[in-house]
């Protein structure tokens, strides 16, 4: 699996997803339901592209990355 993508591409992709998320919440969907669907969509796409084992290996690293604050949007980075 690719280790990195250009920061601009990641930022743009995240912006598209967050815009769709905001629209879904506005339409009345529960954020937990959106999150579950987003995780399923992301993982199923990655499995189709890379296979189950590489995706499972990537997912096994998620707890440490979460605890390190990598997914905390409110954090300040310098």
Where do the protein language model's features map onto the residues?
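Solvent-exposed interaction surfaces and binding hotspots enriched for charged
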Residues: 1-78
């Amino acid at each position: 699996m690719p280790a990195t993508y250009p920061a601009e591409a990641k930022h743009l992709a995240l912006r598209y997803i967050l815009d769709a998320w905001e629209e879904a919440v506005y339409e009345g969907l529960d954020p937990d339901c959106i999150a579950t669907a987003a995780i399923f969509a992301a993982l199923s796409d990655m499995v189709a592209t890379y296979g189950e084992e590489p995706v499972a290996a990537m997912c096994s690293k998620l707890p440490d990355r979460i605890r390190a604050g990598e997914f905390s949007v409110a954090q300040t980075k310098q």
